[in-house]
């Protein structure tokens, strides 16, 4: 058995320092004079323990961390996309993560998203509170450990930093994590470690690397044990064209050994298994050799995990990023079953009605589904690959069920030409983005605006609560129809509504409303108009000074009360309550009250049951 280096991924919001941190880690180790230096892999950088020791100084000893690991293996591509693409059975390929954030800005949308992804994958992580050099008054010392750098700051600057750290602590607490600045942590097993750093100046980098090693020793002892002579297992990072080589597969190996001429199996975008034979294994040349030979790669016969390698092999056009890769020299059927079970292992709880989800890799599909689930968004289907005509048709079927589910959420995939043609003939929505958070936010914002549109449409189709007052000395005609000057006391009144008095008696129907010779279809509170009331007789059905109410059915009342009340003005709500009192006194004491006697449901047939609701 051999102990491999922990695989580390860096996540965080855009422009919060992910790439700068990785560049600085690489840069400081390249500049190191220690023997060995860094090892550059395909898609990754391995920093050996002797280099880490030279950076961390006495911190490893102070934290009682033994130098038993070979080093740290950093995934070069930062962010959610790489993290979710690099997955294996049971979670992320990354053993550890750095959640980086701008200490001057705190949590941002993608920070929350990264935290949710780490939470769902159960990946141990350290928080890097970056850009301490941007705190007003901070006195930077390049490459200094934080513990010394903070001693060189004015007390007001230290206070300012503490305030920002505790804002992060508070937000993490709200998200279900207890945390503290690394030098104040009382229990490393139960608290997330926050390390203030500057990815630009390198301040705090010694403590950050030390905390990562501490996490590795605490959580990963068994996980890092690998069999050197076992057939390799890995994850496809990317399939890409290389000049002079054709299509190649960039892969991260996390277990076993990979040999030239091995037969390997992977998954395609259609979730089928392909088998191919390795023609070449390539690793990056050292930087000085690249400068001399002008070629970036060198052949090797064998690669041992953990490692990043470029594989040259035929028939890999349809291999999907994020696919597991396994050596299958002897037991093809077993390996094929294992690969197919990887797809089944992404447990997607689908619904009869819901949205369609498309993504480019198994990992990104899993991450997207997890976030949609956390927001209670139902999913009809979730698949890898570009949006097809069939997807558009299926989404249009969902649209017929409910407009808000006639939607495709697509992460980092394209719309096929045949699907574009079909899309032009349908009412469905397609949301495309390379940021999962943005996709979910765009969809939820669209749903909310659609709900608002539906509410406005419904509000326009129902009878709104309103009351009027017959103005004294302004009755112009006594009957057929009665015409009087009225003041609108609340709400909006429309032509065609029925008026009742405070005893619940029907007065008549509004036939027309006029102001300065202009016919008005509806008028609102504060208006004074001449109103023609059909079937009403002055002094029989109403008198000067009477207050009349717009009548409505109980169904109309429930529709407003249950769905549209937030769209009414206060005066309309009061009028509706007055109308309910009138109805309860004159018609039914339970008018407008939801019946909570569930026993009567047992006697209803299906149609009556629907009417009940």
Curated annotation (Swiss-Prot):
GTP binds at residues 12-19, 76-80, 130-133. Residues 76-79 are annotated as: G3. This is Probable translation initiation factor IF-2. Residues 3-220 form the tr-type G domain. Pfam families: GTP_EFTU, GTP_EFTU_D4, IF-2. Residues 198-200 are annotated as: G5. Function in general translation initiation by promoting the binding of the formylmethionine-tRNA to ribosomes. Seems to function along with eIF-2. Gene3D superfamilies: P-loop containing nucleotide triphosphate hydrolases (3.40.50.300), Translation factors (2.40.30.10), Translation initiation factor IF- 2, domain 3 (3.40.50.10050). Residues 130-133 are annotated as: G4. CDD domains: aeIF5B_II, IF2_aeIF5B_IV, IF2_eIF5B. The keyword Transferase does not apply. The gene is infB. It comes from the Archaea. Residues 37-41 are annotated as: G2. Residues 12-19 are annotated as: G1. Keywords: GTP-binding, Initiation factor, Nucleotide-binding, Protein biosynthesis. One of its GO terms (molecular function) is GTPase activity. Belongs to the TRAFAC class translation factor GTPase superfamily. Classic translation factor GTPase family. IF-2 subfamily. One of its GO terms (cellular component) is cytoplasm. InterPro entries: EFTU-type, P-loop_NTPase, Small_GTP-bd, T_Tr_GTP-bd_dom, TF_aIF-2_arc, TIF_IF2, TIF_IF2_dom3, TIF_IF2_dom3_sf.
